[in-house]
Amino acid sequence: MQRIMNNPDNIVDEMLKGFLKAHSDIVESTENGRVVKAKDIPEGKVGVVTGGGSGHKPAFVGYVGKNMCDAAAVGEICSSPTAAAFLDACKVADQGKGVACLYGNYSGDNMNVKMAVKMAKKAGITVKTVVANDDVASAPKDQREKRRGVAGEVLMWKVGGAKAAKGGDLDEVIAAAQKAIDNTRSVGIGLTPC
């Protein structure tokens, strides 16, 4: 496969620069170069955050904006964002009402989000999570907790973001996002490896 890129070591940073320029009316950069935030986050609402590895556009930065996610943490190609990136995403999304971190069921994301939640608590930010596990091809029915999050994440972000935009409290946002995932099934396939 032919690819158009400059230095592969800079591909994520260059992708983010291009994305930010192309969508400067919707998103903006933060002090952490691996966190993108919505340009206008209404005051007094629950923050909604996501994140994941690069190379899955439009996920994750493409779902930051009005009535969706307020911030996204960005990792390297097919690699989880750092705990610090997830924490910084929570910090920029926090409007004093808590933060809903809605993400996919991948080991690196699970580990780093759990660390970020602990760090956020120390910083005075309440973060609750919903883990997407909609991919029926990745684990049997009786092992749903092992399933990956794939296309269902989009519905989780939209439902959670809409509930936050309507003024729902943190528990209501979490419940709405969880209900979306609980009622979503997808089949993820890959034609080539990362």
What label would you give each PLM region?
Residues 1-48:
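N-terminal amphipathic/basic leader segments beginning at the initiator methionine
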Residues 2, 46-53, 69-72, 98-107, ...:
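Short glycine-rich or small-residue beta-strand-to-loop segments that form or flank ligand, phosphate
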Residues 3-6, 55, 74-84, 104-108, ...:
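Alpha-helix capping and helix-loop boundary segments enriched in small/acidic/polar residues
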Residues 43-51, 60-73, 137-140:
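Gly-rich Lys/Arg/Thr-decorated short loops/hinges at beta-loop-alpha junctions or inter-strand turns
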Residues 56, 63-96:
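Glycine-rich oxoanion-binding loops at beta->alpha junctions
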Residues 57-59, 83-87, 108-114, 137-140:
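Short glycine/serine/threonine-rich phosphate/pyrophosphate-binding segments
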Residues 72-77, 121-146:
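Short, acidic/small-residue loops that bind anionic groups at enzyme active sites
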Residues 138-147, 157-194:
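Internal, active-site/partner-interface "lid" segment
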